Amino acid sequence: MTYETDTTLMFVAVCEALVGILGNAFIALVNFMGWMKNRKITAIDLILSSLAMSRICLQCIILLDCIILVQYPDTYNRGKEMRIIDFFWTLTNHLSVWFATCLSIFYFFKIANFFHPLFLWIKWRIDKLILRTLLACLILSLCFSLPVTENLTDDFRRCVKTKERINSTLRCKLNKAGYASVKVNLNLVMLFPFSVSLVSFLLLILSLWRHTRQMQLNVTGYNDPSTTAHVKATKAVISFLVLFIVYCLAFLIATSSYFMPESELAVIWGELIALIYPSSHSFILILGNSKLKQASVRVLCRVKTMLKGRKY
């Protein structure tokens, strides 16, 4: 790549990452301050904080990988650094998806209205189950992250060296194919939490439809709190599903780069697209949460006041 292309792509990557990190840091900070003030944290705040912190780590790893790829490509020839980056990328990637799924499940059980005994049993205990569920997600993510480092053999590291023209050999192709297949298989595991979120979304839609029909029969209107809660939860879940699909497409671009002549450019483009998912979803969550939205309005008002004071 040319120097101008490198500079432009790095600038875009840094801007995307910083915006996302600020959004997720805001979520974590507001919930942490609320925890310190009230000496307790609600289940929804715990999920949002865990999700925000996992995405901050994910964005830092993606940005670090972009910087290394452009500025220090020879780093990928050293096994230790590559293993660390790959491990934490896989870990934070899985954590982000699993925590977002926990958020979808929480919205479903808290807001939806069904009368099945199992649903009601979980609905009444969902607040107590959240911490255990998040810990289980952490353990699962750790288990899924370990296998990816086992395929980073010396042969593979020599094959991904960007300065050498040995990518056409059969041995390199086999090594890269094996590594890529492991990454693809590990990410296929994320289809399960994605499916759970999709089912939660569909059931929320069903619950909203039943609720609106009931409102029509009672002639009470559509602006009741339950309808508003349904709509907000549905928006949060559908935004996650759409952005996650975009993220998966970006991952496929980055993974397929092992078989492309301009692999460095393909990886960076994949990572630029991947950064959209954790960055934009954080602001959707802020706008959909009344406490976070009010806090963001207060911050913006203070910033506006400070800027006016400096002007005069």
UniProtKB/Swiss-Prot annotation:
Coiled coil: none annotated. It is found in: Membrane. Glycans are attached at residues 151, 167. Residues 1-9, 71-101, 150-187, 257-266 are extracellular. Keywords: G-protein coupled receptor, Glycoprotein, Membrane, Receptor, Sensory transduction, Taste, Transducer, Transmembrane, Transmembrane helix. One of its GO terms (biological process) is detection of chemical stimulus involved in sensory perception of bitter taste. Expressed in subsets of taste receptor cells of the tongue and palate epithelium and exclusively in gustducin-positive cells. Expressed in 15% taste bud cells in circumvallate and foliate papillae but only in 2% in fungiform papillae. Expressed in the duodenum, antrum and fundus (part of the stomach) and in gastric endocrine cells. GO terms for cellular component: membrane. InterPro entries: GPCR_Rhodpsn_7TM, TAS2R. The chain crosses the membrane at residues 10-30, 50-70, 102-122, 129-149, 188-208, 236-256, 267-287. Its main location: membrane. One of its GO terms (molecular function) is G protein-coupled receptor activity. Residues 31-49, 123-128, 209-235, 288-312 are cytoplasmic. The keyword Glycoprotein applies. It is a multi-pass membrane protein. Several bitter taste receptors are expressed in a single taste receptor cell. Belongs to the G-protein coupled receptor T2R family. Gustducin-coupled receptor implicated in the perception of bitter compounds in the oral cavity and the gastrointestinal tract. Signals through PLCB2 and the calcium-regulated cation channel TRPM5. This is Taste receptor type 2 member 7.
